[in-house]
Amino acid sequence: MKTPFGKTPGQRSRADAGHAGVSANMMKKRTSHKKHRTSVGPSKPVSQPRRNIVGCRIQHGWREGNGPVTQWKGTVLDQVPVNPSLYLIKYDGFDCVYGLELNKDERVSALEVLPDRVATSRISDAHLADTMIGKAVEHMFETEDGSKDEWRGMVLARAPVMNTWFYITYEKDPVLYMYQLLDDYKEGDLRIMPDSNDSPPAEREPGEVVDSLVGKQVEYAKEDGSKRTGMVIHQVEAKPSVYFIKFDDDFHIYVYDLVKTS
């Protein structure tokens, strides 16, 4: 299976997902997305103390099969409580959030924690930031010919660590993305849809236990009859029926409404 490493944003293989792929020209044309990756040799590995690396900048080598080693830099967003080996990472120049077992995956080499800190910024409009969480949106992307293409999706949450970024997913491509949506809103590239007729979630009493699928193993039947397995790793607070799933054969984080009825 093709991996996201070494691919440009939006060119990730979706053959095993059962969904149409996102073409590269649908991604935001920002300078960070125009970086070119070159093959490099592994850097000197650091010692193995298992420090908490959430919030840290990292770099590591990646080698798929007999291919060359490529170097990757990114920010560690989270360590998954139900699978502490699994980290969520935002790589520089890429829009997807990736899930990797950094200390176990044999394709990862020379993992280093970098000295540079993640810059923190003040949210320019806290009320707007809170308002868009859990909302359906229309997000405009610039295509190669300069025209606009509209993607409907849902804003899921403020991203951890990178505090001016938001988690979002799309109907056309239900994986976890990150964008600075306040900027897009102010530029006219993001529109919050009117509230639907869906009833709001019921208020819960303090201390009330709510059933959750987090930590459960899941099985997904593909169109060709084969199956893929994975784990539910997160429940979206703003939409409790929506969950993040990490499949065993993929690095992307999938976003599904697991309680939706037809």
Curated annotation (Swiss-Prot):
One of its GO terms (cellular component) is chromatin. The modification N6-acetyllysine is found at residue 44. Residues 132-193 are annotated as: Tudor-like domain 2. This is Spindlin-1. It comes from the Eukaryota. Keywords: Acetylation, Cell cycle, Chromatin regulator, Cytoplasm, Cytoskeleton, Developmental protein, DNA-binding, Isopeptide bond, Meiosis, Nucleus, Phosphoprotein, Repeat, Ubl conjugation, Wnt signaling pathway. Residues 93-98, 142, 250-252 are annotated as: Histone H3K4me3 and H3R8me2a binding. The keyword Transcription does not apply. InterPro entries: SPIN/Ssty (IPR003671), SPIN/Ssty_sf (IPR042567). It is found in: Nucleus; Cytoplasm, Cytoskeleton, Spindle; Nucleus, Nucleolus. The 3 tudor-like domains (also named Spin/Ssty repeats) specifically recognize and bind methylated histones. H3K4me3 and H3R8me2a are recognized by tudor-like domains 2 and 1, respectively. Belongs to the SPIN/STSY family. Residues 27-38 have a biased composition (Basic residues). The record marks 173, 180, 184 as: Histone H3K4me3 and H3R8me2a binding. Residues 213-262 are annotated as: Tudor-like domain 3. GO terms for molecular function: DNA binding; histone H3K4me3 reader activity; histone reader activity; methylated histone binding.
